[in-house]
Amino acid sequence: MLNEFKEFIARGNVMDLAVGVIIGAAFSKIVDSVVNDLVMPVVGALTGGGFDFSDYFLPLSGNVTAQTLAAAREQGAVFAYGNFITVFINFLILAWIIFLLIKLVNRARASVEREKAPEPAAPPPQDILLLSEIRDLLKQRA
């Protein structure tokens, strides 16, 4: 059973999946940085200057009077929809980047396949076709 497990792990698909998961984890940090350090400041500047979605919340308790999410959570229950907005924007950016990467890879594969594809053979000349028909007819009579 141990040998079967070793064979399973050594397969290309499992190794490719492992590499993909590791790269995906690292890529997630890059996307988080793009969203938090590049996109969100621009969104904040366009919408009135320097606000942060993470402090958007609705108090679910009458005791909550704080202006920041961390302080509001200490006072009572809150509906922290700002974090959801940030995560959703993060997801959209990640999905867009993955879409562009897949499109780029598919385009590269298609160009490589076009280069590898042999030119279709030119049809034989009419005289060769005629001679082939005559040969076939002679074989049938014999």
UniProtKB/Swiss-Prot annotation:
Any single Gene Ontology cellular-component annotation: plasma membrane
Gene3D superfamilies found in the cross-reference section: Large-conductance mechanosensitive channel, MscL, domain 1
Gene Ontology molecular function: mechanosensitive monoatomic ion channel activity
The UniProt record lists the keyword Aminoacyl-tRNA synthetase: no
Topological relation to the membrane, as annotated: Multi-pass membrane protein
Family (UniProt): Belongs to the MscL family.
Name this polypeptide is given: Large-conductance mechanosensitive channel
Organism: Sinorhizobium medicae (strain WSM419) (Ensifer medicae)
Lineage: Bacteria, Pseudomonadati, Pseudomonadota, Alphaproteobacteria, Hyphomicrobiales
Recorded name of the encoding gene: mscL
